[in-house]
């Protein structure tokens, strides 16, 4: 990984690098082998075909035939169904995970690849793509030591979203949940705004995140309260 100053430009015009912003406000440029990018396209197709039947129906991210639009349609339809009763309060929790792709636990991923009966060659390819990576940081003329990474997926790869979808697939809460890769929306309805169903679901989500080596970003996790009453 290389940290350096980069002039921002259209990613559509210049596809040679992937740009991301670190938590320190520094632009991260990740250079990848062109052969690796081509190979990823083929492998990602096989991964999607194998995993499609096991994929959570409420997962809409990076999936053929599903999109942000279909996710919003489902959310709107869910809210509309609750609007018939003017006494209902609907609470929607929009959950964000901190550095989701960077914190992908390779051991957790290996266990879930086995859980979903991935063929050995696909499992080995995904794990070998992530295992044994090293990185260093360069700022100006100064370079850090080279260190090995034990978690995460390289930024801008197809493997990142695919691996995260596999990890989050078994996230099942007691309340309706809509997923878009690493973004999760949880919907609760009650006649009493002080109902604790959403809080209990949040505890479930927190426990699941700890078990899977992930962290909820409390700064970006927001709640929206909706009431259909008049006046």
Language model region names:
Residues 71, 90, 160-167, 198-201:
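Hydrophobic alpha-helical membrane-association signature
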Residues 92, 178-179:
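Hydrophobic "anchor" residues on beta-strands that sit immediately upstream
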Residues 95, 181-182:
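Active-site flanking residues adjacent to catalytic metal/cofactor-binding acidic residues
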Residues 186-190, 227:
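Short beta-strand-to-loop capping motifs
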Residues 190-200:
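Short helix/loop segment flanking the catalytic signature motif in cyclic-nucleotide metabolism enzymes
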């Amino acid at each position: 990984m290389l940290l350096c100053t980069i002039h921002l430009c259209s990613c559509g015009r210049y596809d040679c690098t992937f740009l991301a912003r670190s938590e320190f406000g520094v632009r991260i440029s990740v250079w990848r082998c062109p052969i690796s990018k081509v190979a990823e396209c083929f492998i990602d197709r096989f991964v999607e075909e194998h995993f499609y039947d096991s994929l959570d129906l409420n997962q809409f991210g990076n999936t053929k035939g599903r999109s942000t639009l279909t996710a919003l349609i489902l959310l709107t339809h869910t809210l509309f169904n609750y609007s018939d009763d003017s006494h209902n309060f609907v609470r929607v929790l929009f959950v964000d995970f901190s550095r989701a792709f960077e914190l992908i636990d390779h051991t957790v991923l290996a266990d879930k690849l086995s859980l979903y009966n991935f063929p050995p060659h696909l499992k080995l390819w995904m794990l070998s793509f992530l295992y044994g990576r090293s990185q260093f940081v360069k700022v100006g003329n100064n370079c850090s030591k080279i260190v090995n990474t034990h978690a995460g997926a390289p930024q801008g790869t197809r493997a990142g979203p695919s691996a995260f979808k596999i990890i989050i697939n078994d996230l099942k809460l007691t309340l309706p949940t809509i997923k878009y890769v690493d973004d999760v929306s949880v919907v609760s309805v009650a006649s009493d705004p002080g109902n604790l169903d959403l809080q209990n679901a949040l505890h479930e989500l927190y426990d699941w995140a700890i078990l899977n080596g992930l962290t909820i970003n409390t700064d970006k996790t927001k709640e929206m309260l909706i009431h259909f009453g008049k006046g």
